[in-house]
Amino acid sequence: MSEAVPTSARKSKNAPVAPGPAPVLEIESLDMEARGVGRTVTEDGTPGKVIFVEGALPGERVTYSSYRRKPSYEQATVVDILRPSVLRTQPKCAFFGTCGGCSMQHLDMRAQVAIKQRVLEDNLWHLAKLRAETVFAPIHGPSWGYRYRARLTVRNVAKKGGVLVGFHEKKSSYVADMTSCEVLPPHVSAMLVPLRRLVEGLSIRDRMPQIELAVGSQVTALVLRVLEPINADDEALLRAFADEHKVQFWLQPKGPDTVTPFYPLDVPLDYTLPEFGIRMPFKPTDFTQVNHQINRVLVGRALRLLAPSRDDRVLDLFCGIGNFTLPLARLSREVMGIEGSDTLTTRALANARENGVDGHTTFACRNLFEVTGDDLRALGAFDKFLIDPPREGALAVSKALAEIAQSGEGPLPKRIVYVSCNPSTLARDAGLLVHEAGYRLKGAGVVNMFPNTSHVESIALFERG
């Protein structure tokens, strides 16, 4: 809220008001959304409001314009950079700053990884009073062309000259007018404009709100969300586009369970884990990692940390389609995968059979957000756990392990590898595992699964004894 202006100082309502100079701010750090963070200083020299400035980097001196004001903080955008950071780089994408797909292209990649590591360490310390005994070397790979999964929004916008296909604009429901994308694989980026033209020619151009993208090892799948049936002319256009661009179309008339392949029908969608001789078939609506190259390294790192042997019984929680379960089955006596989705559980079992490891695997569908100590006891003894939860984390699992440890009734795994996509829920769960279940945080490090974004993926190792 702006301050009241004394009556004597008020101008005529018709008189022009010259804007004052933009305020100046020293940027001290970045927050979880890749915004520069600084603090104003009051007239008496005491700290004032915290200012979150989009587009600013640590060490920079900037002027800014606030678009949201609260009593203790403001949100703002950069007006001018008076002293640039040595870590500032030229964004590769012409649409950076407008498109909401990326938030850190203006920051050197090594600095991006270092900042994500600091975010991980800060969360562990501030939320759980923990420091890892070892900081793992970051897992990183290609910075561009890595995004093998994406949800593209489709809008027929007359003011923009036709159909738009792309990510949302930053902090907006509008679709970015983008004709290429540096984080999508090059062949997908090159398809954005042809996709516009394709949709413009369809009878349901106003009834197709999104296209789901999933790139496999042999084919790129495009799932069209269709709110009305397509006609014969539409079918012909889709087939011609698929043949020209070597893609596979799927149609989704309602929920995810209604997704069916349209054309071509004979090309399998899969990804591979060559280190373990695994080929992983999946449907384009299944959860798979966005970055295939990083996923391969991550699976290898996780298994080396877990160090399974032929005598070990391993529990893989939130197993999905078997991304960790199947490689673990190559090295363990037995692996049990538990997943909350019936569909993914069925897919994991089929993938185990496909790869010839069904003799070493079992799968079950359970709600892991409501699991108890008694539920874990009923599963029997496991030597090691691998936990790979969604952003909500594994709170119920962590509480169940703490309950078993404090009761002294029931076996506990001697080692846990926890793969996280949210540092705050990892820190929360780590606090339970260490302070209440008796584990040590042996190591933790970041996984740069999403370069040029503020998303922080990480991996942590816990041991008892």
Curated annotation (Swiss-Prot):
An example Gene Ontology biological process: rRNA base methylation
Entry binding sites for [4Fe-4S] cluster: C93, C99, C102, C181
EC number: 2.1.1.190
Active site: C421
Gene3D superfamilies: 2.40.50.1070, Nucleic acid-binding proteins, Vaccinia Virus protein VP39
Residues binding S-adenosyl-L-methionine: Q289, F318, N323, E339, N367, D388
Positions of region (Disordered): 1-22
Keyword Lyase among UniProt keywords: no
Reaction(s) catalysed by this chain's protein: uridine(1939) in 23S rRNA + S-adenosyl-L-methionine = 5-methyluridine(1939) in 23S rRNA + S-adenosyl-L-homocysteine + H(+)
Domain TRAM per the UniProt entry, residue ranges: 16-80
Keyword match Methyltransferase: yes
Keywords: 4Fe-4S, Iron, Iron-sulfur, Metal-binding, Methyltransferase, rRNA processing, S-adenosyl-L-methionine, Transferase
Enzyme class: transferase
Pfam families, per the entry: tRNA_U5-meth_tr
A single MF term (Gene Ontology): rRNA (uridine-C5-)-methyltransferase activity
The protein's role, per its UniProt record: Catalyzes the formation of 5-methyl-uridine at position 1939 (m5U1939) in 23S rRNA.
Family in the record: Belongs to the class I-like SAM-binding methyltransferase superfamily. RNA M5U methyltransferase family. RlmD subfamily.
Name the UniProt record assigns to this protein: 23S rRNA (uracil(1939)-C(5))-methyltransferase RlmD
Native species: Burkholderia ambifaria (strain ATCC BAA-244 / DSM 16087 / CCUG 44356 / LMG 19182 / AMMD)
Upper lineage: Bacteria, Pseudomonadati, Pseudomonadota, Betaproteobacteria, Burkholderiales
